[in-house]
Amino acid sequence: MQLSSSFPISPPKIFPSTKHHKPPVITHQLAAQIQSNRRHFVSPVKVSGYFSSISRAIEEEEEYRKARAAVNRKGVELESYAIEGISVGGHETCVIVPELKCVFDIGRCPSRAIQQKFLFITHAHLDHIGGLPMYVASRGLYNLEPPKIFVPPSIKEDVEKLLEIHRTMGQVELNVELIPLAVGETYELRNDIVVRPFATHHVIPSQGYVIYSVRKKLQKQYAHLKGKQIEKIKKSGVEITDTILSPEIAFTGDTTSEYMLDPRNADALRAKVLITEATFLDESFSTEHAQALGHTHISQIIENAKWIRSKTVLLTHFSSRYHVEEIREAVLKLQSKVSAKVIPLTEGFRSRYS
């Protein structure tokens, strides 16, 4: 006899059976009930084959949930800075610090980069600069002020040509302030923030950037004076304070590990947050291979870890061949060698469970 769909008794969701069945989908409520039952149920047969399958399903579901949560994270909070973005070797790199209105490289121009006023380009490979015209055009579309884009001086002319081509093809203005900034030069972003490039080593011209906070400190010889006395000296035109630059965030872009051995890059290695690449993570690629491609193997960071004085290291630019779990395993090896907290930027990477 065929039952109508309006039959008042719903069929049970799980039918006990001695036959092998694919483990059912376990809801959180059912999982909790099963775990509770198992704590209070005593039997000579501790776990039947069926309940063993349920237990495995619970464990696998929890692993999957954790892995997906790790993959879906959009950003991290590091040393009071919210840092977000994506950096997949050879595909795209764009790291954003909203608090400072800064973007390091533009990748394919993710939408959340458009609101940031300052863009720092490390080098001219497409996975780092490809979205530049879109970034400029999008700011114009939203009636935002023209961005300030900082580039290595060697590529300024070519970037201008690139923008001019898009102006011609799209018949648009593309308003921008393009600033060539050489290694060692300093540019004031705000009255309390400056930027200074540092030398990196890639297969084409490249440079990293350090963002510094700026504060004024009263010179020692005036420390004993009272407020009115200090004000009087200031009005006379005498400089009574020293300018203190503190490295906050350093971004390397693509580079070999050689930058870590350059004493002129000490500020990058003592910034509160060091954002550095680690393209290769395992023994299937040698350090020589990484060096030839202008990249860094994580073993080279481990080897030179003694030079790192940063509070936090954010690793980026992993090869797309790696899963999130492999990245985290490699990070643990580095973490054991440095006092800094080591965090991987894993947006854009797949989990083994996805």
Swiss-Prot record:
<comment type="subunit">
    <text>Homodimer.</text>
</comment>
<keyword id="KW-0479">Metal-binding</keyword>
<dbReference type="GO" id="GO:0042781">
    <property type="term" value="F:3'-tRNA processing endoribonuclease activity"/>
</dbReference>
<keyword id="KW-0106">Calcium</keyword>
<protein>
    <recommendedName>
        <fullName>tRNase Z TRZ2, chloroplastic</fullName>
        <ecNumber>3.1.26.11</ecNumber>
    </recommendedName>
</protein>
<keyword id="KW-0255">Endonuclease</keyword>
<keyword id="KW-0862">Zinc</keyword>
<dbReference type="Pfam" id="PF12706">
    <property type="entry name" value="Lactamase_B_2"/>
</dbReference>
<feature type="transit peptide" description="Chloroplast">
    <location>
        <begin position="1"/>
        <end position="68"/>
    </location>
</feature>
<keyword id="KW-0464">Manganese</keyword>
<keyword id="KW-0934">Plastid</keyword>
<dbReference type="GO" id="GO:0046872">
    <property type="term" value="F:metal ion binding"/>
</dbReference>
<feature type="region of interest" description="Disordered">
    <location>
        <begin position="1"/>
        <end position="21"/>
    </location>
</feature>
<dbReference type="InterPro" id="IPR036866">
    <property type="entry name" value="RibonucZ/Hydroxyglut_hydro"/>
</dbReference>
<comment type="similarity">
    <text>Belongs to the RNase Z family.</text>
</comment>
<comment type="function">
    <text>Zinc phosphodiesterase, which displays tRNA 3'-processing endonuclease activity. Involved in tRNA maturation, by removing a 3'-trailer from precursor tRNA.</text>
</comment>
<dbReference type="InterPro" id="IPR001279">
    <property type="entry name" value="Metallo-B-lactamas"/>
</dbReference>
<dbReference type="GO" id="GO:0042780">
    <property type="term" value="P:tRNA 3'-end processing"/>
</dbReference>
<keyword id="KW-0809">Transit peptide</keyword>
<keyword id="KW-0378">Hydrolase</keyword>
<keyword id="KW-0540">Nuclease</keyword>
<dbReference type="GO" id="GO:0008033">
    <property type="term" value="P:tRNA processing"/>
</dbReference>
<keyword id="KW-0460">Magnesium</keyword>
<dbReference type="GO" id="GO:0009507">
    <property type="term" value="C:chloroplast"/>
</dbReference>
<keyword id="KW-0819">tRNA processing</keyword>
<keyword id="KW-0150">Chloroplast</keyword>
